[in-house]
């Protein structure tokens, strides 16, 4: 019998002010207060009833917001996850191949701890932010007890036949299962016609001879990116459930019955959303949200270098003076690497401002070291040019829109 897994990656960047914990009014989310509220109404509340039949992950920071502001939807997500379909995610949405080993370990451990607290069990799988992967990242996952992850077809040199998972053996001698989702079907759900046509979607899923057909998209595809996408998803799941020739299940249940038989080799570093590996989060690789606009992304490398420098300094300060400093310093030092800060087209965008606010808050919490750290950060941000002449560089952006 053919197995089908439909995975949704549900995530929003942390929008809360790192000083107050509250999300400022976001006028472009009207008639809602902010984008979290709007997307919860358009997507999360509507797709919750389908989660029990899916594989899914929710970003821990999104669940933290949902627990406080959408408790009904949160309860439905937790109930579905406890039934077995949920997989974990690192605590923040960092590009792990660009992170130091200690930060990878921290993010994975925090993600597992958050999952355990919410879902009452150990996670078997973990979704990687942007599916960004390298050998060290998978070694950290395997060392933490994670049994599998999910990657795009172009992230392995050769996928096992039949849609089956493969073993990956890390440089550290550990082993982890890797599922490869169907790239063509997933693309046509996320960006093409299938999310509007349940009949065509079911036909595509059942036409392949593969023993496993896995689809993976952003969860916001269903209702937010595509109005009524949640309705089509529900129809697809209901139709498949009535058939006796397919089994709709999770990656974990499939893995319990079918251990990998082949080994896979990574294309690394790589991700699902940048054909240049992970360059979108550290360089002007050509990837941008609005390719029709003639913008530069020369700011990405200086922003990454500035925060890498600050991270090293903050970790050193915390290790020397940890007992005298609040642990919140370390949380903000990780949160400032949220991937959205580099994903879009200009350093003056709200996503980059958010990561710089976390950097500013971490500096503030460093006590007597704060003036030195801020001066060093500003020196490096001066090398990050905005596309907006009225903004100038990252230095001016920090001083006018970030610093308190």
Residue ranges of predicted features:
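Acidic, His- and aromatic-enriched active-site or binding-groove loops in soluble protein domains
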Residues: 73-86, 109, 121, 142-177, ...
């Amino acid at each position: 019998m053919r197995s089908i897994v439909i995975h949704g990656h549900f995530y929003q960047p942390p929008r809360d002010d790192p000083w107050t914990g509250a999300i400022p009014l976001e006028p472009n989310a009207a008639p809602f207060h902010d984008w979290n509220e709007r997307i919860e109404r358009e997507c999360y509340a509507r797709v919750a009833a389908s989660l029990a039949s899916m594989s899914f992950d929710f970003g821990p920071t999104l669940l933290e917001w949902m627990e406080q502001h959408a408790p009904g939807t949160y309860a439905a997500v937790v109930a579905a996850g406890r039934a077995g379909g949920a997989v974990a995610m690192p605590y923040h949405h960092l590009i792990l191949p660009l992170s130091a080993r200690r930060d990878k370990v921290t993010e994975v451990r925090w993600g597992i701890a958050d999952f355990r607290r919410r879902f009452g069990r150990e996670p078997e799988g973990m979704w990687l932010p942007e599916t960004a992967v390298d050998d060290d990242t998978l070694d950290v996952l395997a060392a933490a007890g994670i049994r599998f992850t999910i990657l795009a077809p172009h992230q392995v040199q050769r996928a096992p036949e039949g849609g089956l998972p493969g073993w990956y053996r890390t440089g550290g001698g550990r082993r982890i299962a890797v599922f490869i989702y169907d790239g063509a079907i997933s693309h046509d759900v996320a960006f093409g016609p299938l999310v509007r046509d349940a009949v065509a979607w079911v036909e595509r899923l059942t036409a392949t001879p593969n023993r496993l057909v896995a689809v993976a998209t952003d969860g916001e595809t269903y209702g937010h990116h595509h109005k009524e996408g949640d309705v089509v998803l529900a129809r697809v799941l209901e139709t498949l459930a009535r058939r006796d020739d397919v089994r709709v299940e999770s990656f974990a249940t499939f893995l319990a019955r079918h251990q990998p038989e082949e080994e896979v080799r990574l294309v690394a570093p790589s991700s699902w959303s940048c054909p240049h590996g992970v360059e979108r989060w550290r360089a002007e690789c050509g990837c941008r949200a609005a390719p029709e606009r003639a913008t530069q992304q020369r700011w990405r490398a200086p922003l990454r270098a500035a925060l890498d420098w600050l991270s090293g300094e903050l970790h050193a300060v915390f290790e020397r003076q940890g007992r005298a400093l609040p642990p919140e310093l370390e949380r903000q030092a990780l949160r400032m690497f949220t991937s959205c800060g580099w994903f879009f087209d200009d350093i003056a965008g709200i996503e980059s401002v958010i990561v710089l606010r976390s950097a500013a808050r971490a500096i503030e919490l460093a006590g007597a070291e704060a003036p030195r750290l801020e001066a060093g950060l500003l020196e490096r941000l001066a090398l990050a040019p905005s596309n907006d002449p009225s903004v100038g560089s990252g230095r001016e952006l920090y001083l006018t829109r970030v610093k308190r």
